[in-house]
Amino acid sequence: MTKRPTRYYSKKQENLIAKELGGNRQPNSGATMFSKGDVVLDDWLIEAKTKTSPSNSMTIHREWLEKNEEEAFAMGKQHSALIFDFGDIHYPQEYVIITLEEFKKLIKGE
């Protein structure tokens, strides 16, 4: 069986997130000069990370979070988040990482 390229899984995840949140998937995963991130909402820039096969763990790099925050600011977005999954199609659960400050705003309804 031929293994699909990483891009296949990333694009699938990005499309799912965009559909679920009512946003738009960025072409080429935001690799252009002015369009960054993977999924864009009105006030949010989303970075998406997935595994190509089921896993029990996921390494989160600080660089991913910091870069997404910087790109969100540069694009005039008020919020940034990293959404990831463990690559398991039988348990397709997505998880969201935001700062504690963002979380406080959400629970206070700000």
Describe these PLM feature segments.
Residues 1-110:
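Catalytic phosphate/metal-binding cores of nucleic-acid and nucleotide-processing enzymes, i.e., regions
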